[in-house]
């Protein structure tokens, strides 16, 4: 969840900055083809900037510290576990980081399979058994081995392209309609302030709506990462880890879902914006072996 949230926030910020620069400098495409090229460049540009910054952003956001040399038995176990699983998964040894937080959490990120990072919280190491922690680490290793961050970047790039393209087409129409035609009979792009305001608002709104697509992909890949963990360390260990998460977080999640859904009943709507499937669904998928085939 951490890596996806940071990726999307950074990506959205880059898109907004690009849009501001274009609008303030008066750079507008005069043709649909030109606008599409611009949307492709900036849409994928935002995604790849987010990907390249992902390790730095993730570590900075949680105050994580990369383990260069293990200082105690716990760090030694963590590094050895990551090394063993990386070797089993056929990827290069990721950087290993630890950060101080009471919650049970871990994430993996990085621009390439062979230049990745796995970070775990102190809460995970303190509150999970070695088998459960091993399963969570294997889950993150599976994300790296599956190339999920790169695939997410490509999907987000396509989504960004359409968000920018459609937003600016509609902004040009709105600016032209509200700005009227020029007296000399030449075609006008309309009021630039209207264009700037409409384009910015539409990019934000469409960006949030488009996140439904990326959230769906994220949930889908979580099932595959769970299956990858089961293959590396065993199905029962991964199920035990998810059950531990369920007992640790379910009461808090119920409260937050009520706030989000207003009446606390419309869980299906809230799931559209979740990066992870409900824990019960993940446990059931492991038990049935749906993604282990």
From Swiss-Prot:
Family, as annotated: Belongs to the peptidase M48B family.
Entry keyword Iron: no
Name of the molecule in the record: Protease HtpX
Gene Ontology CC: plasma membrane
InterPro entries in alphabetical order: HtpX_protease, Pept_M48_protease_HtpX, Peptidase_M48
Keyword tags: Cell inner membrane, Cell membrane, Hydrolase, Membrane, Metal-binding, Metalloprotease, Protease, Transmembrane, Transmembrane helix, Zinc
List of catalytic residues: 140
Binding site for Zn(2+): 139, 143, 222
Cofactor: binding comment: Binds 1 zinc ion per subunit.
UniProt membrane topology term: Multi-pass membrane protein
A Gene Ontology biological process term: proteolysis
């Amino acid at each position: 969840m951490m890596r996806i949230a940071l990726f999307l926030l950074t990506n959205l910020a880059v898109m907004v900055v690009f849009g501001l620069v274009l609008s303030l400098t008066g750079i507008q495409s005069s043709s649909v083809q030109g606008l599409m090229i611009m949307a492709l460049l900036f849409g994928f540009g935002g995604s790849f900037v987010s990907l390249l910054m992902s390790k730095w952003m993730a570590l900075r956001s949680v105050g994580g510290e990369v383990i260069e040399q293990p200082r105690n038995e716990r760090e030694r176990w963590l590094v050895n576990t990551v090394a063993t699983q990386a070797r089993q998964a056929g990827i290069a040894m990721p950087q290993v980081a630890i950060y101080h937080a009471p919650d049970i959490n871990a994430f993996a990120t990085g621009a390439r399979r062979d230049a990745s990072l796995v970070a775990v919280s102190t809460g995970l190491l303190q509150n999970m058994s070695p088998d459960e922690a091993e399963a969570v680490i294997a889950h993150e290793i599976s994300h790296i081995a599956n190339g999920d961050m790169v695939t997410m970047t490509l999907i987000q790039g396509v989504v960004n392209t359409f968000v920018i393209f459609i937003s600016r087409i509609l902004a040009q129409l709105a600016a032209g309609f509200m700005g009227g035609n020029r007296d000399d009979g030449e075609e006008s792009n309309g009021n630039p302030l209207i264009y700037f305001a409409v384009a910015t608002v539409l990019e934000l709104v469409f960006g949030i709506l488009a996140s439904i697509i990326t959230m769906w992909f994220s949930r889908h890949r979580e099932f595959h990462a769970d299956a990858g963990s089961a293959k590396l360390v065993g199905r029962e260990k991964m199920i035990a880890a998810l059950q531990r998460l369920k007992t640790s977080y379910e009461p808090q999640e119920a409260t937050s879902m009520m706030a989000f859904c207003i009446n606390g009943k419309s869980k299906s709507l809230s799931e559209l914006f979740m990066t992870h499937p409900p824990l019960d669904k993940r446990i059931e998928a492991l038990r049935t072996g749906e993604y282990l085939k």
